Amino acid sequence: MLLLGLLLLTALAGARLLWNKWKYRSLHLPPLAPGFLHLLQPDLPIYLLGLTQKLGPVYRLRLGLQDVVVLNSKRTIEEALIRRWVDFAGRPQMPSYKLVSQHYQDLSLGDYSLLWKAHKKLTRSALLLGIRNSMEPLVEQLTQEFCERMRAQAGTPVAIQKEFSFLTCSVICCLTFGDKEDTLVHAFHDCVEDLMKSWEHWSIQVLDIVPFLRFFPNPGLRRLKQALENRDRIVEKQLRQHKDSMVAGQWRDMTDYMLQGMGKPKVEKGHGRLLEGHVHMSVVDLFIGGTETTATTLSWAVAFLLHHPEIQQRLQEELDCELGPGASGSRVPLKDPSRLPLLTATIAEVLRLRPVVPLALPHRTTRHSSILGYDIPEGTVVIPNLQGAHLDDTVWEQPHEFRPDRFLVPGASPRVLAFGCGARVCLGEPLARLELFVVLARLLHAFTLLPPTGPLPSLRPRSHCGINLTMQPFQVRLQPRGAVAPGPSQHQ
């Protein structure tokens, strides 16, 4: 049976390749990279950038039964996602996407349509209008509580990634459900962690490339389905509680706002309507997109500052000048980040070097289009290599070096693309930037970051085979400002 399946798969692949070659014979397509095992490269975004030396910034890769187009420069990414955004606003329909998104009722994974636009409008309104007044004070409050917990562990090695993860999960729980109770935060944190681990497993990645394999036994697929059942059970419980207790015309949090606003974004007749399932998946998007991503960026920032204590010292001097010396209660200047220019530049540099979703999520062309004179047929899967664009030495001077000062001169450096751009830009970008700004300001104002005994944390990402650019686990010691620093022997 297995042999028969493999023979059939080979025959289908050959037929598909011959059909595509005949179908697109008159088009000027991007050059095709030789080989078909590209996804096995340990540092995929850097590998894809390296292919530009021979192929240019736009080329094709063969993945399974289809070719995908890779965009490796800021110019090509912005041309596709901003200037020709309608052409490139689609999402490919892959087996794991269908499972994770409840049949594409999801903003991140759903295909472009009038219903998708209405869904996006509702979720964006909930973020920007429904909780606008509570977002900043909430992030400030939870960050202060986080710093107090860290003060209780002062001087001892702390697994800062895990602490950041619980902090960002608490923020999302409060904004989405109006609740930061530890049991709920831990339940959602563990749920998201389990889901992402299952989704990024190699067996699911292979399934997306060769969908035919879903007909064969797959323990990884079974684990993913179990993680999704657990996710949906937790979210549905919260939705029931909100429906039973909410008051019409009032909203306590984003869930209230979205449940009451489902019918407000008008969708043309015949294009469907927003249902509770769309609210369900908006909640899922907020947790997946707003927990580990922000926590990982904060962790990268700490790791870079451990390697560059001179930058940390300059940041603390800037914070002392603006907020006063020591861990004072002065408010972080959220309305005018330019008052902390080095902090703003440091965040931009971390996002440039380590965009958490380095290959974004794949796009799909909704109609025939073109990039740099190359034809891009309708239905083509397109991968924006965000990290590759950030490391392009024709755009950035010494692109692999951590140099926040490059962003201190207005207009001297391009805008980073870490949150994507165009119609598919991350809706949570304002919240993520707020958290990065407040947490790093408070953390560096209250503590000096010191390495534990032993080597500094690795700045090399883990081998990239999933969605997020993760880092090696590490620990940090948080020395309260003004306290006596440890001796030199402890700074090895």
From Swiss-Prot:
One GO MF term: 17-hydroxyprogesterone 21-hydroxylase activity
Matches recorded under InterPro entries: Cyt_P450, Cyt_P450_CS, Cyt_P450_E_grp-I, Cyt_P450_sf
GO CC annotation: endoplasmic reticulum membrane
Cofactors named for this entry: heme b
Keywords: Endoplasmic reticulum, Heme, Iron, Lipid-binding, Membrane, Metal-binding, Microsome, Monooxygenase, Oxidoreductase, Steroid-binding, Steroidogenesis
Protein localization: Endoplasmic reticulum membrane; Microsome membrane
Gene Ontology biological process terms, A to Z: glucocorticoid biosynthetic process; steroid metabolic process
Residue numbers binding heme b: R91, K120, H363, R424, C426
PROSITE patterns cross-referenced by the UniProt entry: CYTOCHROME_P450 (PS00086)
Enzyme Commission numbers on file: 1.14.14.16
Topology relative to the membrane: Peripheral membrane protein
Residues holding progesterone: R231
Enzyme class: oxidoreductase
The reaction(s) this protein catalyses: 17alpha-hydroxyprogesterone + reduced [NADPH--hemoprotein reductase] + O2 = 11-deoxycortisol + oxidized [NADPH--hemoprotein reductase] + H2O + H(+); progesterone + reduced [NADPH--hemoprotein reductase] + O2 = 21-hydroxyprogesterone + oxidized [NADPH--hemoprotein reductase] + H2O + H(+)
Residues that, per the record, bind 17alpha-hydroxyprogesterone: R231
PANTHER family, sorted: STEROID 17-ALPHA-HYDROXYLASE/17,20 LYASE, STEROID 21-HYDROXYLASE ISOFORM X1
Membership in a protein family: Belongs to the cytochrome P450 family.
Function: Specifically catalyzes the 21-hydroxylation of steroids. Required for the adrenal synthesis of mineralocorticoids and glucocorticoids.
Domain notes: The leucine-rich hydrophobic amino acid N-terminal region probably helps to anchor the protein to the microsomal membrane.
Protein name: Steroid 21-hydroxylase
Native source organism of the sequence: Felis catus
Taxonomic lineage from the root: Eukaryota, Metazoa, Chordata, Craniata, Vertebrata
